[in-house]
Curated annotation (Swiss-Prot):
Gene3D superfamilies: Glycogen Phosphorylase B (3.40.50.2000)
Protein name in the entry: Uncharacterized glycosyltransferase MJ1059
GO molecular function, one term: glycosyltransferase activity
UniProt cross-references to CDD domains, sorted A to Z: GT4_GT28_WabH-like (cd03811)
Keywords, in A-Z order: Glycosyltransferase, Transferase
Length: 406
């Protein structure tokens, strides 16, 4: 390989993987295309970031966005002739497909390779609506024109290859990266005064995630009602924002949990909340590789998680095969798996609709976590597992992949 630094262009919602961008910036001559205003940290030269700054997120305008993006991206590729273009998230992945095809036809940059980075389980993520149909069609007919498809877990690789036969020899596994030392440093920042009373003399469970269908927090809140019947001082805090915020708050009010469950919105530093909590509870219906589970482990927080597809099992129970049949709850090496929830909205008061089996199981596990000190100690070893996803380890995997591609 030549000593000359290779040229990379990375495209997508770049702030979602800031650690990776910093890593690329050290190794390669890079440009970063961001569709929306990123959270610029000052750690990467702003001149390297090409901001499309798209204001509207109206799905009806999406086809026009693709055309506009195609023109802009082709112009960038013609100018910079990158050795490699990496796109991140399916929004960016679909946007690059016309560029790949036009580049093949018109030879705009003959040596440019393309890697599509998939973050989620597409079969669960894209079930309804025109946008979902377009994404699935892209997987089925067009993703094969990329050089490599990056997935984050063994199970997601299996799902994608079984549903989209043309991608069978394209997929490679590279997990997310985490700056473990930095997360631990951030966790030491003091809590703001208005939050301190929540943690005073209480056993606190924490959940972090967007307030959307995918994250299943209504199941968690309903389950927590059962916990408070036995432990009235127990608390649940949920960090994140999203379209279900009002619905979730309404559910909290209906269940008279205003003094037990707190929706604290998006927090710039969620790690200090993790540090002050006693147990992390993950209620998602589906995932890719859940960041927050690994972040909780990095602070040695006990974790209870649904065994949703994909991610939690591979993180918390590396001793299991992804296809193993298990009984729930399953007490894994680094966390506890509970029975996954169905895609069912339940907003009624508990008196109208009793807890389902999965909710009872989750509630009973939370109660057990409060009562069993030995169990908490057993699952306070998560840092050991989180280190498997540390940036210093994953950077080597990325480097091998990139050097093998270009």
């Amino acid at each position: 390989m030549s000593n000359k630094k290779k040229q990379l262009t990375v495209m997508g919602t770049v702030w979602d993987f800031w650690s990776v961008l910093k890593m690329f910036d050290k190794l390669y001559e890079s440009k970063y295309i961001s569709f929306y205003e990123p959270w610029l940290k000052g750690e990467i030269d702003k001149e390297k970031i090409i901001l499309f700054n798209e204001k509207s997120k109206n799905p009806l305008l999406w086809p026009f966005k693709i055309l506009k993006r195609t023109y802009k991206i082709l112009k960038i590729i013609r100018e910079f002739k990158p050795d490699l273009v990496i796109t991140h998230h399916d929004d960016a992945n679909v946007s690059i497909i016309p560029v790949i095809l036009l580049n093949k036809i018109f030879k705009i940059s003959n040596n440019t390779k393309f890697i599509l980075w998939v973050r989620n389980n597409p079969i669960e993520s894209y079930k309804e609506g025109l946008y979902s149909k377009i994404i699935i069609l892209a997987y089925k007919y067009f993703y094969k024109y990329a050089d490599i498809i990056i997935v984050q877990t063994q199970e997601n690789k299996k799902i994608i290859e079984s549903h989209f036969k043309s991608l069978k020899n394209k997929t490679k596994i590279v997990p997310n990266v985490y700056e473990i030392d930095k997360l631990q440093q951030l966790s030491n920042e003091p809590l703001e005064k208005q939050y301190r009373n929540i943690f005073k003399d209480s056993f606190v469970f924490i959940n972090i995630g967007r307030l959307t269908e995918q994250k299943g927090q209504w199941f968690l809140i309903r389950s927590f009602k059962r916990v408070t019947e036995k432990y009235p001082n127990a608390k649940l805090i949920i960090l994140g924002d999203g379209e279900l915020k009002n619905k979730l708050q309404e559910l909290i009010n209906k269940l008279n949990l205003q003094n037990n469950v707190y929706l604290l919105g998006m927090q710039k530093n969620p790690f200090k909340f993790l540090k002050h909590s006693n147990c992390f509870v993950f209620s998602s219906l589906w995932e890719g590789l859940p960041n927050t589970v690994i972040e909780a482990l990095s602070l040695n927080l006990p974790v209870i998680s649904t065994d949703c597809k994909t991610g939690p099992r591979e993180i918390l129970c590396p001793e299991l095969n992804i296809s193993d049949k298990i009984d729930y709850p399953y007490y894994g090496k680094y966390g506890i798996l509970t029975k996954p929830f169905s895609r069912e909205f339940i907003w009624q008061d508990l008196n109208e609709k009793p807890l389902i089996e999965e909710e009872k199981m989750l509630a009973d596990l939370m109660i057990k976590m409060i009562e069993d000190e030995d169990l908490r100690k057993r699952y306070s070893n998560g840092l050991e597992r989180a280190k498997d996803f540390d940036i210093e380890k994953i950077i080597k995997e990325w480097k091998l992949l990139i050097e093998g591609t270009i």
